Amino acid sequence: MTFDSQAYAAQLEDKVTRLRDLLAPFDAPEPTVFDSPLQNFRLRAEFRLWREGGERHYAMFSQDDKRTPILIEEFPIASLRINQLMPQLKAAWQASAALSHKLFQVEFLTTLAGDAMITLCYHRPLDEHWHAAATKLATDLGVSIIGRSKGKREVLGLDYVVEKLDVGGRTFSYRQPEGAFTQPNGTVNQKMLNWAYEALGDRSDDLLELYCGNGNFTLPLATRVRKVLATEISKTSVNAALSNLAENAVDNVTLVRLSAEELTEALNEVRPFRRLHGIDLKSYEFGSVFVDPPRAGMDPDTCELTRRFDNILYISCNPETLAANIAQLHDTHRITRCALFDQFPWTHHMESGVLLTRR
């Protein structure tokens, strides 16, 4: 593909128009638009391996044809580090039966801070020959390597990468574990964090955060409020978030492993939860709620939960479900800020954000 700036501008304008049209029924202000680098923006990549001509090649498949591989030699949308590592890793497995035997998938995870991890997935047990070859490879490439085989995992180095992002004049450090969700476009993620930081503003009350992940938004937003109650259901993400809070000396956040639906029940005093033992929900003075839900958006009950807060800061990876949730809240809240974040250039996907305030 060609990375033409005019083509990119036209595609981005199409996304702006789509978001504008979806939010028009709610009298939304004009969205602030945060663009992306045209290439080398994607910090993670996953490839299947395909045998052809007696060699294994990086391969991907189109959405329309899962049978015919597209052989990949370079991947311009991926970070420069991934593009540097791809030929080095390929040369290594071509030279080593211990590395290449029954290797079927490769995953790269990198950061703006320069960290990198490679996951190698196999249809066989990992033996001492693999361990020796992979240990040398990790040293040669300056990366952590994780071997996966039939539910087992071997870690050479660390099982996370470290990202550093500047938000509100402060640098935050993030552990991003292997296998956990991370924002793929680091440059746009940093813009998104700064927008959310500015939109929330300095407050003297408390924040409720649903779907906090590894603490991507939690860390900077916690510096804007008295204290935060954050929820997440993934164990891996919860552990990463706790590490990130400690690493950044953010001590006003309580993290609970509850779903949004369970938290709704807890706040409505439907039933008690052991995981809330020792946490006095009545001690919180919530003025704002921050939500970053999955593509399906908020379920109706969670949407109703957010209605009780004066400010709803909402980051969405699906503008259609965002619009549906806003429609449910529109009688009590209005959109006061709106933004489009081009996390996924050269695709129809977009990330968007709104600040809803009580009428």
Curated annotation (Swiss-Prot):
GO molecular function of the protein, one example? Answer: tRNA (uracil(54)-C5)-methyltransferase activity, S-adenosyl methionine-dependent
**Enzyme Commission number(s):** 2.1.1.-, 2.1.1.35
- Name the residues that bind S-adenosyl-L-methionine: Q183, Y211, N216, E232, D292
Biological process (GO), any one: tRNA methylation
Q: What SUPFAM superfamilies does the record tag this protein with?
A: S-adenosyl-L-methionine-dependent methyltransferases
Q: Where is the active site?
A: C317 (nucleophile), E351 (proton acceptor)
Record's keyword terms, sorted: Methyltransferase, S-adenosyl-L-methionine, Transferase, tRNA processing
Show the CDD domains listed in the entry.
AdoMet_MTases
What sort of enzyme, by top EC class, is this? Answer: transferase
Stored InterPro entries: MeTrfase_TrmA_AS, MeTrfase_TrmA_CS, SAM-dependent_MTases_sf, TrmA_MeTrfase, U5_MeTrfase_fam
Q: What does the record give as the reaction this protein catalyses?
A: uridine(54) in tRNA + S-adenosyl-L-methionine = 5-methyluridine(54) in tRNA + S-adenosyl-L-homocysteine + H(+); uridine(341) in tmRNA + S-adenosyl-L-methionine = 5-methyluridine(341) in tmRNA + S-adenosyl-L-homocysteine + H(+)
- Provide one Gene Ontology cellular component: cytosol
Q: Does the keyword Transferase apply?
A: yes
Q: Does the keyword Membrane apply?
A: no
Record-linked PANTHER family: TRNA/TMRNA (URACIL-C(5))-METHYLTRANSFERASE, TRNA_TMRNA (URACIL-C(5))-METHYLTRANSFERASE
Q: What does this protein do?
A: Dual-specificity methyltransferase that catalyzes the formation of 5-methyluridine at position 54 (m5U54) in all tRNAs, and that of position 341 (m5U341) in tmRNA (transfer-mRNA).
| Family per similarity comment | Belongs to the class I-like SAM-binding methyltransferase superfamily. RNA M5U methyltransferase family. TrmA subfamily.
| Record's protein name | tRNA/tmRNA (uracil-C(5))-methyltransferase
